[in-house]
From Swiss-Prot:
Keyword hit for Ribosomal protein: yes
UniProt note: domains: The N-terminal domain interacts with the head of the 30S subunit; the C-terminal domain interacts with the body and contacts protein S4. The interaction surface between S4 and S5 is involved in control of translational fidelity.
Gene Ontology terms for molecular function: rRNA binding; structural constituent of ribosome
Superkingdom of source: Bacteria
Function statement: With S4 and S12 plays an important role in translational accuracy.
Domain (S5 DRBM) ranges: 17-80
Protein's recorded name: Small ribosomal subunit protein uS5
PROSITE patterns named in the record: RIBOSOMAL_S5, S5_DSRBD
HAMAP family, per the entry: Ribosomal_uS5_B
Bilayer-spanning residue ranges: none
Protein family membership: Belongs to the universal ribosomal protein uS5 family.
Gene Ontology cellular component terms for the protein in this record: small ribosomal subunit
An annotated GO BP: translation
């Protein structure tokens, strides 16, 4: 409880990371004596320069669930390569029944993406992208599919290194 109070007294996160809440669900556990109510929170955290992480937390109270989710998201940060506020190439991500297609866009396009995908792009610093989700609209599955696709993206220099060529030879 002291951690929650200390966090609410500060104006923002002290580590400079952007935080976004995606979903809070009320969950119940049925036991012999009745129902036990709880809350599950889904959050994303990013530094605005390509690092992004997702976390989920469960607790009997909303603030504690959110705090747990934020801490998990901070522990799970992954670095994604960004070029001029967008991706290097078109990528597809899958998780469960969710499928996400992300297409790089020219400067000035903005973030054209729905719900949970938009939050992921905002915290990681992508400013121009077009994204479409297919299949499951479950926020957890959509975020995991988005992160799966982002982790599968590569730069031209990474492809060149794998092939043993230079970047100029790849584009020639």
């Amino acid at each position: 409880m002291a951690k929650i109070q200390a966090r609410t007294q500060n104006e923002g996160p002290e580590d400079g990371l952007r935080e976004k809440m995606i979903a809070i669900n009320r969950v119940t556990k049925v036991v012999k004596g009745g129902r036990i109510l709880g809350f599950a929170a889904l959050t994303v955290v990013g530094d605005g320069d390509g690092r992004v992480g997702m976390g989920k937390g469960k607790s009997k109270e909303v603030p504690a669930a959110v705090q747990k989710a934020m801490e998990e998201a901070r522990r799970n940060l992954a670095k994604i390569s960004i070029k001029n506020g967008t991706l290097h190439h078109r990528v597809t991500g899958h998780w469960g029944a969710a499928s996400v297609v992300m297409i790089p866009a020219p400067k000035g396009t903005g973030i054209i993406a729905g719900g949970p995908m938009r939050a992921v792009f905002e915290v990681m610093g992508i400013t121009d992208i077009v994204a479409k989700s297919h299949g499951s609209s479950n926020p957890y599955n959509m975020v995991r599919a988005t992160l799966d696709g982002l982790k599968n993206s590569t730069t031209a220099s990474e492809v060149a290194a794998k092939r043993g060529l230079t970047v100029e030879e790849i584009f020639a």
